[in-house]
């Protein structure tokens, strides 16, 4: 016991105390060299002075009065050290237990991983077994299919062989039958020839008798027929009443055939002139039998309708409106007094109201109107002259008077001196000039053209009044915008039957703005704007026409109008270049009639 000698008093663990086992020393000795520096004798370095000091201390302790207290203190220290060692032992045991638990957890984890791996291996093995089974099954199916195909091929080969054998048998039978037939026919021919050779004199006698009888029969028939016809003709000639009746009947038959043939043609032309419509006329207000049958209500409304204002729905400048109103009044008075109508030429840009005014003029004057286009004349070729005469013949049969409106008249009423006009078109133009050479109280001729300078001089001579329809000004454009906005937008929206609504904005102000933006546009282009607004509203999801949609359509129309103007300028430059190539061409054009 070292504590008895006063040694190692501050150490936490006295030597030789039973309890926590000391860890073994590492193999190979201490770090100071191992067996190399270890002494050969274990008692060679023993120091006996320590024992002497211990013995001396023990004697002093026994002689001291505090020996008992020192002993108790040593016991207490020893107990404290033992308790500390026990606590360390418990900690060590807890650490060992934790290590065991960790080992158990690791073993469980390894076992779980092993089980998972075994499960995967089992699954892989099962999948592989299933794959092998499927492959075996597919191989079996393939083998079975190959076997079936082989059996089928063998059956087909067997059938083909049987069919070949059957065909060979049939061919052999046919060949034998043919040989037998040939032998039979040959035998019959030999027998027949032998019989004919033996009976040749009898056969010749029979033929001779039949020919004599036939000749006698024919001669007797000719004699009998001649006698009958001769007696009949003699009887017919002797009776003059029969001769007269026969001649009269043949004459009446010939006259009837000729009359029916020519009368049908005359009746057809009369019906076509009175009731039909010529092929050149595209549109007419004149009532025909076919239209009366197809549209009886429309025809009845037209008959009983009141006289309309000539400028109703037509928006023109004040000066032009005053002039065309005078023309309408003069035409109406001419119709009432059965005077001679005046021919009018209306020229100007397209879409300025020429066709609309012609229709309104006819309705205002209680006249029928017929519209034909100049572009329909040229394709007719040689039939153009006949068609032109049919138009004027049909116009002359109108009881109310007819306003014949020729739209795009410059398409066929060109100068005859130019090389571009064909002979058929030249003949049609001559027919037109012939039928319009004098004033008429049956029809009124109204020509419309965008290029009146291309007219033949004789056409200009037949015109009594020239009216220029210019593009609408600011005031006219505003009236047109308001008219078509009301017609295509406001009226459908107010009826409530259609899917069209208008957003809230100042309509009057917007119409004034649009009139300013649409400078240079014609009335037709403005009307198309109204249709575009309506289409935009129908195309929207909610059916509401907004101010932005109106502005977008107007901007698009302005861009298109500018593009058209650029094309027109380019075309004008090209025509100017062509005229510059032949400076004598304007002097050669025009042939007065």
UniProtKB/Swiss-Prot annotation:
EC number: 3.6.1.-
Catalytic activity line of the entry: ATP + H2O = ADP + phosphate + H(+)
Annotated TM spans: 243-260
Composition bias, Pro residues: 12-27
GO MF assignments: ATP binding; ATP hydrolysis activity; protein serine/threonine kinase inhibitor activity; zinc ion binding
Disulfide bond sites: none
Segments in the Mitochondrial intermembrane topological domain: 1-242
Residues annotated to bind ATP: 348-355
Coiled-coil stretches noted in the UniProt entry, renumbered to this chain: 51-215
UniProt region (Disordered), positions on chain: 1-64, 109-129, 145-164, 570-593
Recorded topology in the membrane: Single-pass membrane protein
Keyword tags: ATP-binding, Coiled coil, Hydrolase, Membrane, Mitochondrion, Mitochondrion inner membrane, Mitochondrion nucleoid, Nucleotide-binding, Transmembrane, Transmembrane helix
Biased composition (Basic and acidic residues): 33-44, 53-64, 109-121, 150-164, 570-580
Any one Gene Ontology cellular component term annotated for this protein: mitochondrial inner membrane
PANTHER family found in the cross-reference section: ATPASE FAMILY AAA DOMAIN-CONTAINING PROTEIN 3, PUTATIVE ATP-ASE
Function: Essential for mitochondrial network organization, mitochondrial metabolism and cell growth at organism and cellular level. May play an important role in mitochondrial protein synthesis. May also participate in mitochondrial DNA replication. May bind to mitochondrial DNA D-loops and contribute to nucleoid stability. Required for enhanced channeling of cholesterol for hormone-dependent steroidogenesis. Involved in mitochondrial-mediated antiviral innate immunity.
Subunit and interaction comment: Can form homooligomers. Homodimer formation at the N-terminus may be regulated by ATP and is required for the interaction with the inner surface of the mitochondrial outer membrane and correct mitochondrial homeostasis.
Comment, domains: The transmembrane domain and a C-terminal adjacent region contain all information necessary for mitochondrial targeting.
UniProt family annotation: Belongs to the AAA ATPase family.
The protein's name in its UniProt record: ATPase family AAA domain-containing protein 3-B
Species for this entry: Xenopus laevis (African clawed frog)
